[in-house]
């Protein structure tokens, strides 16, 4: 199995508090290949409709239980070869962020954890407007 975690830099997360770290750690423990990508690394391959690719880095746990990767090992993959993509980055809700959700929307095969369409349509700062009784 192969999981991709689209997230903020994994080497900068707090391993005692971050739920994404816990997902990755458990996935690695179970023998699942885990990869990291930055949203800006996702692209559509020219002249190939629906070929959405990304540059990725393989994630490992070092001896201190921190996530590590080697930037020189950046490789390109077809995102439909992943079993699941976890969209976990903190949103700067800007055009790059929106464009990334549209590209990920085009994928047919992998399980998308945090649906890009719903992320785009219901930004966390606005979702509370749907529940005024809770504010």
Where are these regions (language model features)?
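Conserved N-proximal alpha/beta basic substrate-recognition cap immediately N-terminal to
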Residues: 11-135
